[in-house]
Amino acid sequence: DIPLKKTYSETQPFRRMKVRQKKEIISLGREDINPRELTGDYVTPQELYAMYENNEDVIVLDTRNEYETRVGLFENAVDLQLDTFRDFPDAIEQLPEEYKDKQIVMYCTGGIRCEKASAIMLKAGFSDVKQLEGGVLDYFNKTDGKYWNGDCFVFDERVALDTDLNETEYIYCYICLSLIHI
C-alpha cells in the first residue's frame, strides 16, 4: 500500500508531474538494506507527542539533511548534520555507544527515508529503533505541532510549511543553493 498524503496550497507547488519506476526511491547504493525485510516499528504522531508529554527517556533522531534541519526540527532532537542521506550510515557510527541500547525514534519529512534509516540502524546493532509514521508532515496533521521548533522544509515550490501545513516565508535560491527566510 502507498498512503495518499494531501496538503492544500493556494499556489501550484509542483512545476510538473513525472511518474517513473525506480529501483530505489532514496538511493544508498547498498543492496544489503531492504526495508521490506527489515525496518523499525512505527510510532504514530500521537504516540511521539505522548512521549514528549510524559518526558519519556527516548532519543529523537533527525534523519534529514542539514539544510532541512536549519529550517526546523523536534525539540531536543539529535541532528546528524548530514550533507546527503548517503552520509547516514557513517554518521550513526559516531553516535555514543550507549545509544545502541536506548529507545530511538527517528523522523524525516514524510517517512520514506526512515524506512531505510531504521534498517541501517538495526543492522548496525541499535536494538530499539522506531520511526515516526508519516513523518513530520503527518505529525503536523495529527497533532497541534507542539514540540516542533521552526518550520519543515518540503521538496516543492512551497519550500517550507508551518505546523498548520501553511506555506511559510522561505525561498530557495537556485544560484547559491541556499534557503532564505524572507
Protein language model regions, located:
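Redox cofactor-anchoring modules in respiratory/redox and cofactor-processing assemblies
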Residues: 122, 133-175
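Conserved small/polar residues in nucleotide/adenosyl-binding loops
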Residues: 180-182
